[in-house]
């Protein structure tokens, strides 16, 4: 399931919509600092023909082959942001436009979707966020705390009407998972039930149109 390509697309009308092709966990091998390495990697190709509001997205790869994915496009005061400076005073709340989560659970031999997803953030002294993720679907409830270890970001300034520009800052954060709790009909699992967990999160602000 991890190395099978999944395709999703949606059309909103008036020629606007998106398409995405994803490999949730492609098996990879290579060298790092001259040493052989094996693992999994997430790949995606996204085509968007629509205004891009802010979003939260994250992906965790667990060492047994399981993965957890969440996505939360939203409206917030940061939609008016015009630069890449993090943790603006207006970054205080957000209103989800949609919510989606996925847990491919190897030990339970199933994949579960989640339509209830909450994402909150706290910030350390260096300006890096910790993401607090809560997902549930009536069968399984997942709680995650994942600390960003660094930040990479890209900015887009696109000319629009009247000589003005629309702006989008897109952030990537490699994650250190400090808490993981999965509660389902068979019991509770936590961070100690897995060894290595690797992940990445995205957070954006502004509105590209």
Task: List where the protein language model places each region.
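Structured soluble/peripheral alpha/beta segments that form catalytic or ligand/cofactor-binding pockets
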Residues: 1-209
């Amino acid at each position: 399931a991890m190395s099978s390509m999944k395709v999703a697309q949606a059309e909103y009308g008036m020629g606007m919509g998106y398409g995405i092709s994803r490999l949730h966990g492609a098996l990879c091998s290579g060298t790092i600092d001259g040493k052989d390495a094996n693992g999994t990697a997430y790949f995606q190709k996204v085509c968007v023909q629509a205004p891009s509001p802010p979003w939260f997205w994250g992906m965790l790869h667990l060492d047994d082959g399981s993965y957890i994915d969440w996505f939360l496009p939203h409206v917030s005061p940061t939609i008016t942001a015009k630069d890449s400076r993090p943790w603006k005073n207006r970054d205080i709340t957000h209103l989800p436009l949609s919510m989606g989560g996925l847990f491919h659970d190897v030990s339970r031999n199933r994949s579960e979707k989640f339509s209830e997803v909450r994402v909150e953030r706290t910030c350390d002294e260096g300006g890096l966020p910790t993401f607090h993720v809560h997902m549930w679907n009536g069968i399984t409830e997942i709680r995650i705390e994942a600390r960003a270890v660094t930040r990479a970001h890209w900015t887009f300034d696109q000319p629009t009407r009247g000589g003005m520009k629309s702006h989008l800052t897109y952030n990537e954060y490699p994650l250190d998972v400090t808490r993981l709790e999965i509660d389902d009909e068979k019991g509770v699992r936590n961070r100690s039930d897995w060894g290595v967990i690797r992940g990445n999160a995205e957070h954006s602000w502004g509105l590209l149109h």
